[in-house]
Amino acid sequence: MSEVVTVKQTNMENIYECEFNDGSFRLCTRNLVSGFNVYGERLIKYEGVEYREWNAFRSKLAGAILKGLKTNPIRKGTKVLYLGAASGTTISHVSDIIELNGKAYGVEFSPRVVRELLLVAQRRPNIFPLLADARFPQSYKSVVENVDVLYVDIAQPDQTDIAIYNARFFLKVNGYMLLVIKARSIDVTKDPKEIYKAEVEKLENSNFETIQIINLDPYDKDHAIVLSRYKG
């Protein structure tokens, strides 16, 4: 296995680039829970600090960063509502980035998957797993505070509508949304580019300002991620 040569801070807070002796590069985050990985990712020790390799084929946020995301609104101390947290791959890296003074509320609909997320959260006190249906944000309104960032990764035909509805409940004015658009979950017959355009129009008609649209290929085929700001 290749060995790490250097670890450098990227232009995004708490996100690093690991260079290996074979000339390859990987994203990584500083491990909040030293000695433990989450999804089989490599742990990297460098100058007395442990980092976790961030696999862009397993995490759409990592893919977006490698595909040129200009700014990451998730930083140290950020409060995040994550819809579609699944078993905890991406939200665990969010946990590393926001550190202990941040909070990551993870909504997941599947009881089986939430059990896996709970295991991750047991070691990460800044992750708050919620077994809930993202279509009904009122069901978790009593436990989720207003957040700085809404991250949405759900496979529903009305995923953008669900995101907008949650934003009205929880996203601060001038807060940011990272919306994963899964073209094949919306319409298998249309060109993905047409779908991305239509979903962005929905956002802009609901007081969101589009900042950037990123096609996630080759990390995720027929997926895009949209960074937008909520004007309230």
UniProtKB/Swiss-Prot annotation:
GO terms for biological process: box C/D sno(s)RNA 3'-end processing; tRNA processing. Pfam families: Fibrillarin. S-adenosyl-L-methionine binds at T89, T90, E108, F109, D133, A134, D153, I154, A155, Q156. Keywords: Methyltransferase, RNA-binding, rRNA processing, Transferase, tRNA processing. GO terms for molecular function: histone H2AQ104 methyltransferase activity; RNA binding; rRNA methyltransferase activity. It is an enzyme of class 2 (transferase). The keyword Membrane does not apply. Coiled coil: none annotated. InterPro entries: Fibrillarin (IPR000692), Fibrillarin_CS (IPR020813), SAM-dependent_MTases_sf (IPR029063). It comes from the Archaea. Its EC number is 2.1.1.-. Involved in pre-rRNA and tRNA processing. Utilizes the methyl donor S-adenosyl-L-methionine to catalyze the site-specific 2'-hydroxyl methylation of ribose moieties in rRNA and tRNA. Site specificity is provided by a guide RNA that base pairs with the substrate. Methylation occurs at a characteristic distance from the sequence involved in base pairing with the guide RNA. Interacts with nop5. Component of box C/D small ribonucleoprotein (sRNP) particles that contain rpl7ae, FlpA and nop5, plus a guide RNA. Belongs to the methyltransferase superfamily. Fibrillarin family. This is Fibrillarin-like rRNA/tRNA 2'-O-methyltransferase. The lineage of its organism: Archaea, Thermoproteota, Thermoprotei, Sulfolobales, Sulfolobaceae.
